[in-house]
């Protein structure tokens, strides 16, 4: 059985992330969205809320589960019996960092392969950082995130 781990901070999960998960759910037996605690990134939403939002966005996909983690990704992959890391590449600028990460993960978890998917063109420009910035300035984010995420961002930035 192929069990893929899609790690990220997902602060917040966007339509680009959702698209990648939907496509992965057709390619793999099981998809685990691994929501990283990432305290050094000082996330806008606490881990529990990011997990809940990811569950809401993917609840229509029966072979997808969402789990929060705060350990080393290689250790978490072993705990989850994952044999693949899935990462998205939006642009060439993402590649250098992702390439380094894949090589480090290969050293730490040699039995887990790293695979990259590019986003659908309509989502290739979306990033969680941009979505947060637009929301903070009162812009319309409904094109970029699921309604539950838009609501959470609106509530977070109420003035």
Swiss-Prot record:
Enzyme class: transferase
InterPro entries, per database record: Cyt_trans-like, PPAT, Rossmann-like_a/b/a_fold
Residues that hold substrate according to the record: 9, 41, 73, 87
Residues the entry annotates as binding ATP: 9-10, 17, 88-90, 98, 123-129
Pfam family, one: CTP_transf_like
The protein's required cofactors: Mg(2+)
Domain of life: Bacteria
The EC number(s) this enzyme carries: 2.7.7.3
Record-level GO cellular component terms: cytoplasm
One GO MF term: pantetheine-phosphate adenylyltransferase activity
Cellular location(s): Cytoplasm
Matches recorded under CDD domains: PPAT
Pathway in which the depicted protein is active: Cofactor biosynthesis; coenzyme A biosynthesis; CoA from (R)-pantothenate: step 4/5
Chain positions of site Transition state stabilizer: 17
GO process annotations (BP): coenzyme A biosynthetic process
Keyword field: ATP-binding, Coenzyme A biosynthesis, Cytoplasm, Magnesium, Nucleotide-binding, Nucleotidyltransferase, Transferase
Catalytic activity: (R)-4'-phosphopantetheine + ATP + H(+) = 3'-dephospho-CoA + diphosphate
Family that this chain belongs to: Belongs to the bacterial CoaD family.
Subunit structure: Homohexamer.
Function summary: Reversibly transfers an adenylyl group from ATP to 4'-phosphopantetheine, yielding dephospho-CoA (dPCoA) and pyrophosphate.
Name used for this protein in its record: Phosphopantetheine adenylyltransferase
Gene, per the UniProt record: coaD
């Amino acid at each position: 059985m192929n069990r893929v781990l899609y790690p990220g901070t997902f602060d917040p999960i966007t339509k680009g992330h959702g698209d990648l998960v939907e496509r992965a759910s057709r390619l793999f037996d099981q998809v685990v969205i691994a929501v990283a605690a990432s305290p050094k990134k000082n996330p806008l939403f606490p881990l529990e809320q990011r997990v809940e939002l990811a569950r809401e966005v993917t609840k229509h996909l029966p072979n997808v589960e969402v789990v929060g983690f705060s350990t080393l990704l290689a250790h978490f992959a072993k705990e989850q019996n994952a044999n693949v890391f899935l990462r998205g590449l939006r642009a060439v600028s993402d590649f250098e960092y992702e390439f380094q990460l894949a090589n480090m993960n290969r050293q730490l978890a040699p039995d887990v392969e790293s695979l990259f998917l590019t986003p659908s063109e309509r989502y290739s420009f979306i990033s969680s950082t941009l979505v947060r910035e637009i929301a903070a300035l009162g812009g319309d984010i409904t094109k970029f995130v699921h309604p539950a995420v838009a609501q959470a961002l609106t509530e977070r930035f109420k003035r």
